[in-house]
Amino acid sequence: MHDTLAKIRKFRDDRDWKQFHDPKNLSVSISIEAAELLELFQWMSGEEATRYAAENKERVSEEIADVAIYLIELADITGIDLAQAIEAKLEKNAKKYPIEKSRGVSTKYTHLK
């Protein structure tokens, strides 16, 4: 991840774009790029989307990468260790969604019995 972050920083800095990359603008960009990813699957069934993703891996990969690049940069400029944040969130989610209550169901944790 460190090498990827260094490449993202270099790409940005070589173009003097750091001035535009604040938390608000990066959050907006994440949302826009996520919408572009979502648009690829618009109006498809789950089965169609799975097939499309397999058949159009490069296109899907590019949109995922766009989201990830902005997300990694947002974590960087806000001083958030992304790997650590993910680990902490997984631990929190494990408590919200215990296996014995959530296995095989898509119910939100507030409605699990």
Predicted regions and their residues:
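Flexible "arm" and connector segments at domain edges
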Residues: 1-64, 68-113
